[in-house]
């Protein structure tokens, strides 16, 4: 499924019955979030609210509300194909030189895909058809959703934030929520380890008296949005990876007020700066954990320009107790993670992030165990190999006879193969999601690893239990009789 911008993608979704246009007047205050939540929970379509109460601009919600639509957005036909995408990312993360001509030929499809990666800069673009600047800038003209009753203010949720460190050639793309506090001001809530925050810290150290340039794209094409949340190698620009997903180069254009590249087809672009000394108290907001989070000070983004397409579409979402869009994204990207992990740890059979674990807080791993202590090595590998799992609080490791995606299997393994004292690993003072109020200190908490594998010599001195198996001849015979038994 190939497309060039968000509108073309929406047309394709509509043709497949994956998009519904709502013509009734719907309020961005609470009503849109309620409709989107109900729709997502029944795996319903993307929604285009064509008549937002009090606004002229339509609002797009639930775009990535099913794993299938995430896969389509990444240029794949289904979630199974995301495994192949993960293999390509594993190849890009650690490319190995071919061992011979035959292997070189086998790698040609991968290198052909890589040719689509560099972005293409345009001189003019749809995202700058309308330009608003200076005193005319008014963020209250945008139909920014207010998702939960106790949220402090409307919140931009799908803004693609573009930044660049003072000593870096690569520009960073990230998704950070932004609280509306004035007609030209937003609070930029980014965690300290995220790319935008790192760029900002480097800028502050280099230019302590100069404003930090920022651009935010709303309504970019799905490949570019998803590139910003995918575990790509640090050396690979998100625009380049988006080109790979899309099958043709990402088209960008320079921002009007700074040198940052923005998606040429974006619906809306906010341009401006962060004063290195200006912060504001952010929140509380209902978030993906299902709770309202604490308040904290974050940098203030001052918007100097708004550019947009004619008849622009505002792209939004809500977050709440799973399932929500972040949980669905995590479920789909789970398939991308597996080949990347297997590249480093070939013994991994499956890796699963249960959606009810708030996308990433708990992982279940199944392995082909090869030696005593193997499960602990895998735990450490999961926590350290990809930055995405820095905040994973619980890692459960099972043997490959356990289905990682079946809680009945996993609970059976924990209760029959695990001794709490011997098989539980606790690590203190590790990075934890700032939103995790269960941690004793904001941003710092503990992790637990559970070894639910069969124990080898050196791990136990007892005779290990032998699993019960059925006599297959008897099973086959009863299968043949079953319809006659009246049961």
From Swiss-Prot:
Residues that hold prenylated FMN according to the record: 175-177, 189-191, 194-195
Gene Ontology molecular-function annotations: 3-octaprenyl-4-hydroxybenzoate carboxy-lyase activity; metal ion binding
Family annotation (Pfam families): UbiD, UbiD_C, UbiD_N
Catalytic residues (positions): 287 (proton donor)
Cofactors that this protein relies on: prenylated FMN; Mn(2+)
InterPro entries, sorted: UbiD, UbiD-like_C, UbiD-like_N, UbiD_bacteria, UbiD_Rift_dom
Involved pathway(s): Cofactor biosynthesis; ubiquinone biosynthesis
One record GO biological process: ubiquinone biosynthetic process
Catalytic activity: a 4-hydroxy-3-(all-trans-polyprenyl)benzoate + H(+) = a 2-(all-trans-polyprenyl)phenol + CO2
The protein's Enzyme Commission number: 4.1.1.98
Subcellular location: Cell membrane
Membrane topology: Peripheral membrane protein
Cited function: Catalyzes the decarboxylation of 3-octaprenyl-4-hydroxy benzoate to 2-octaprenylphenol, an intermediate step in ubiquinone biosynthesis.
SUBUNIT field: Homohexamer.
Protein's UniProt name: 3-octaprenyl-4-hydroxybenzoate carboxy-lyase
Lineage: Bacteria, Pseudomonadati, Pseudomonadota, Gammaproteobacteria, Pasteurellales
């Amino acid at each position: 499924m190939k497309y060039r911008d968000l509108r073309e993608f929406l047309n394709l979704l509509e043709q497949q019955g994956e998009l519904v246009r709502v013509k009734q007047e719907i309020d961005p205050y609470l009503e849109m979030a309620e409709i989107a939540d109900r729709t997502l929970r029944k795996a319903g379509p993307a929604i285009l609210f064509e008549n937002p109460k009090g606004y002229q601009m339509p609002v797009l919600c639930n775009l990535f509300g099913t794993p299938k639509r995430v896969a389509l957005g990444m240029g794949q036909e289904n979630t199974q194909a995301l495994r192949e995408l993960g293999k390509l990312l594993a190849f890009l993360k650690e490319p190995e030189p071919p061992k011979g001509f035959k292997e070189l030929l086998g790698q040609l499809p991968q290198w052909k895909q890589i040719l689509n990666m560099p972005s293409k800069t345009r001189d003019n673009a749809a995202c700058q058809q309308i330009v608003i600047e200076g005193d005319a800038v008014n963020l209250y003209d945008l139909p920014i959703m207010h998702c939960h009753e106790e949220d402090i203010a409307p919140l931009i949720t799908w803004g693609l934030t573009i930044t660049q460190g003072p000593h870096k050639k690569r520009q960073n793309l990230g998704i950070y929520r932004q609280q509306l506090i004035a007609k030209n001001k937003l609070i930029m809530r980014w965690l300290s380890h995220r790319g935008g925050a790192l760029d900002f810290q480097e800028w502050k150290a280099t230019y302590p008296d100069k404003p930090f340039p920022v651009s935010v794209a709303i309504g970019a094409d799905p490949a570019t949005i998803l590139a910003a949340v995918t575990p790509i190698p640090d050396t690979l620009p998100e625009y380049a990876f988006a080109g790979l997903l899309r099958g043709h180069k990402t088209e960008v254009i320079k921002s009007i007020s700074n040198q940052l590249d923005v998606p040429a087809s974006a619906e809306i672009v906010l341009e401006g700066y962060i004063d290195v000394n200006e912060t504001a108290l952010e929140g509380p907001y209902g978030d993906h954990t299902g709770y309202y989070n604490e308040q904290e000070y974050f940098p203030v983004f001052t918007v100097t320009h708004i550019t947009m397409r004619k008849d622009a579409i505002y792209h939004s979402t809500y977050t709440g107790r799973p399932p929500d869009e972040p949980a669905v994204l995590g479920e789909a990207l789970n398939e991308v993670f597996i080949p990347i992990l297997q590249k480093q740890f070939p013994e991994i059979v499956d890796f699963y992030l249960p959606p009810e674990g708030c996308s990433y807080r708990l992982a279940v791993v199944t392995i082909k165990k090869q030696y005593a202590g193997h499960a602990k090595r895998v735990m450490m590998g999961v926590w350290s190999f990809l930055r995405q799992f820095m905040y994973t609080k619980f890692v459960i490791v099972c043997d490959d006879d356990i289905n990682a995606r079946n809680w009945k299997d996993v609970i059976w393994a924990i209760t029959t193969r695990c001794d709490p004292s011997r098989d539980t690993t606790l690590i203190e003072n590790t990075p934890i999601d700032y939103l995790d109020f269960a941690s004793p200190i904001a941003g710092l908490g503990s992790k637990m690893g559970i070894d639910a594998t069969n124990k080898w010599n050196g791990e136990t001195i007892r005779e290990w239990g032998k699993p019960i198996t059925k006599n297959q001849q008897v099973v086959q015979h009863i299968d043949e009789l079953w319809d006659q038994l009246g049961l």
